[in-house]
Amino acid sequence: MSDMSDLEDDQTGHCGSGEHSGPFDPKRHAREQHNALERRRRDNIKDMYTSLREVVPDANGERVQASRAVILKKAIESIEKGQSDSATLSVDVAEQESKNAKLREEIARLKAKKDPSSSQSIIQ
């Protein structure tokens, strides 16, 4: 049998394995379809792991190729760090907004003290 036997068999409509002599073997066709679908699924997962490894800090700088478990672990660590940093920054923003509001009030108070007629205009 040549490497092209499957292609030749598909073109003639006959099964190359000799299992069935009919023009079309539904079981073989279903198996081939399933195998092709499974191969595409595995390729897609492999591509996604590669993409994830490239964007996750510390997973792309290793000399040896990181295992899938290491890639997922690093991704989880990166996400958790990002969430922690985000929470910390949110607290910092709230503190700065509070300080700004107090400073605006102080500016308005000092302006009113300096010029009582301008007490109506508050800095926004």
UniProtKB/Swiss-Prot annotation:
**One of the GO BP terms on file:** determination of adult lifespan
Which Gene3D superfamilies did the record assign?
Helix-loop-helix DNA-binding domain
GO molecular function terms listed in the Swiss-Prot or TrEMBL record:
DNA binding; DNA-binding transcription factor activity; protein domain specific binding; protein heterodimerization activity
- Note the coiled coil stretches, chain numbering: 86-113
Residue span of region Disordered: 1-44
Question: Does the record carry Transcription as a key word?
Answer: yes
Tissue distribution of the protein: Expressed in D-type motor neurons.
Q: Using the UniProt annotation, give all residue ranges assigned to the region (Basic motif).
A: 29-42
Keywords, sorted A to Z: Coiled coil, DNA-binding, Nucleus, Transcription, Transcription regulation
Q: Which residues form the bHLH domain?
A: 29-82
Residue ranges annotated as compositionally biased, kind Basic and acidic residues, are: 32-44
Annotated stretches, region: Helix-loop-helix motif = 43-82
Q: Which Pfam families match?
A: HLH
How the protein assembles, per its UniProt entry? Heterodimer with mdl-1 in presence and absence of DNA. Interacts with tdpt-1; the interaction promotes axon regeneration after injury.
Q: What does this protein do?
A: Transcriptional regulator which binds to the E box motif 5'-CACGTG-3', when in a heterodimeric complex with mdl-1. Involved in the control of lifespan in response to dietary restriction, the decline in protein homeostasis associated with normal aging and may overlap with the insulin-like signaling pathway. Involved in promoting infection by the microsporidian pathogen N.parisii. Required for the expression of svh-2 and the promotion of axon regeneration after injury.
Q: How is this protein named in the record? A: Max-like protein 1
Q: What is the lineage of its organism?
A: Eukaryota, Metazoa, Ecdysozoa, Nematoda, Chromadorea
